[in-house]
């Protein structure tokens, strides 16, 4: 029987493996692809193939990330795995690989470790909405009570960071044993546990809302005035869609303005509607060119509001990555590059943190000199004289 061809009709979900170093994240990633390949739903990827992650640049930061893809009966998955702890931190903060959910890998033989805690905290801060747990290395634990103890610890840890610890699916197994079985050509008892894990992922991690179904938002890149037609604002639609007759708000920098869309164009052609991912020009009724500038956003009324004070989780580039060579302190005033513009802001460090060294990640409070459209999960770069020195994500809006 010929293998089914790739089916675009299955819903697409982005996930990744997280957890402490050497607990088996990469082995599990390899095992999932191997077990599903026996069902004609994936291409088998070797451990080394995943572990030698190519380096990618995201906002001027080099991150090593491996991407694999596979399907279950119900879904198509893109799965990311990072080789080093620092790569996870960078990946989650820059949103290089946006995750709809994560598989937390915990070694049943060791229990939760410092990076287990840190990855759960990061998931909470950067907005990874759902976590499913795989207790790995079950073959190395003879005592059932020990296994149950680790499970309780993991649930308590999840609850401590406001994940529903009691309701989180936890599947025990051995990624290595499943991988060995699959390489020998069969789905055995360990492979079944990997399939059980994927069934839990299918059921527990909801299908994400597609970008086109979200509230319309377009960062303003440029503004022109066209004689006889009015003001055209150009940019790439970040989410949602826009069509002639829609009411929109212009948010950020100055007081929020309301207006109506009188035209949507792409490459000088009229469009019925523009949607997420399109680079468009939007004609606005009665808006003057000088009332709109780069750094504002066009959006569905009421969907996003302007703010100037927020908390963020940031990663500070190391010297080797082209970042600062020296630490910074409270009252450091860099530029925050959000969507299309730089806004100066001052940083306050958390109590007990004297300074931040290049290569650190830390939670900060920022006060900008102008209000701009912000919400939980908004990504930003931190720049100094045009070069990127850090990256971050908004974790809490203060005012």
Curated annotation (Swiss-Prot):
The keyword Protein biosynthesis applies. Residues 81-84 are annotated as: G3. Residues 136-139 are annotated as: G4. Disulfide bonds: none annotated. Residues 19-26 are annotated as: G1. Mg(2+) binds at residue 26. It comes from the Bacteria. Its EC number is 3.6.5.3. Residues 60-64 are annotated as: G2. This is Elongation factor Tu. It comes from Helicobacter acinonychis (strain Sheeba).
């Amino acid at each position: 029987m010929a293998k089914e061809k790739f089916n675009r009709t299955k819903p697409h979900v982005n996930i990744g493996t997280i957890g402490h170093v050497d607990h088996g994240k990469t082995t599990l990633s390899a095992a999932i692809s191997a077990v599903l390949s026996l069902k004609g739903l994936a291409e088998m990827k070797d451990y080394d193939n995943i572990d030698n992650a190519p380096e990618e640049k995201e906002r001027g930061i080099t991150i090593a990330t491996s991407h694999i893809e596979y399907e279950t009966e119900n879904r198509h998955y893109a799965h990311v795995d990072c080789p080093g702890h620092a790569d996870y931190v960078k990946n989650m903060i820059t949103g290089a690989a946006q995750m709809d959910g994560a598989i937390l890998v915990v070694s049943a033989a060791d229990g939760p470790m410092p990076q287990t805690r840190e990855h759960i905290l990061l998931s909470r801060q950067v907005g990874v909405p759902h976590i499913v747990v795989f207790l790995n290395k079950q073959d190395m634990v003879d005592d059932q009570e020990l296994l149950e103890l680790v499970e309780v610890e993991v649930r308590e840890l999840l609850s401590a960071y406001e994940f529903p610890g009691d309701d989180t699916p936890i599947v025990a197994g051995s990624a290595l044993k499943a991988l060995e079985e699959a390489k020998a050509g069969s789905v055995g008892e360990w492979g079944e546990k990997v399939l059980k894990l994927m069934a839990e992922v299918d059921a527990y991690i909801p299908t994400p809302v597609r970008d086109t179904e979200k509230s319309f938002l377009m960062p303003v890149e440029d503004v022109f005035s066209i004689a006889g037609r009015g003001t055209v604002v150009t940019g790439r639609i970040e989410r949602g869609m826009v069509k002639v007759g829609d009411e929109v708000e212009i948010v950020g920098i100055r007081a929020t303005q309301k207006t109506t869309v009188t035209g949507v164009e792409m490459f000088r052609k009229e469009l019925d509607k523009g949607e997420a991912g399109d680079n468009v020009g939007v004609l606005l009724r009665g808006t003057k060119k000088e009332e709109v500038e780069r750094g504002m956003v066009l959006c569905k009324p009421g969907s996003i509001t302007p703010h100037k004070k927020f908390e963020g989780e940031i990663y500070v580039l190391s010297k080797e990555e082209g970042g600062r060579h020296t630490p910074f302190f409270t009252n450091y005033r860099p530029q925050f590059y959000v969507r299309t513009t730089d806004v100066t802001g001052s940083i306050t460090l958390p109590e007990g943190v004297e300074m931040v060294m290049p290569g650190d990640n830390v939670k900060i409070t920022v006060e900008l000199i102008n209000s701009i459209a912000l919400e939980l999960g908004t990504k930003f770069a931190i720049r100094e004289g045009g070069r990127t020195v850090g990256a971050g994500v908004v974790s809490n809006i203060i005012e």
